[in-house]
Amino acid sequence: MEKNKKIDFSIGIFDDISENIKKRVKKEADNCEIYGVGVYSDEIVKNEYKTSPIRSEEERMNLVKNLEGVNFIFLVDSIDVNEIKKIVEKACKGVLKNRN
């Protein structure tokens, strides 16, 4: 990844985007140069959170991609920290490549 770029992200289910979520995302995005949002896959929500998402993962990704301050989105299909790190790094590389 490009040095000296502060990159931050949030991960969640994001079935509903409340005003509080919009404010939180904007605040977090304002404190970094590149901000991303990860959306848990339908499978992770069902198997790990023991619930069913209201919206499909595609619909949820469409909701978060238009939030103010979001530079990239990514699907999270693992709860393993090392796998999530790889997913985020891959998504960040795409954003950094497009910025240059």
How would you describe each model-predicted region?
Residues 1-100:
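Nucleotidyltransferase catalytic core that binds NTPs
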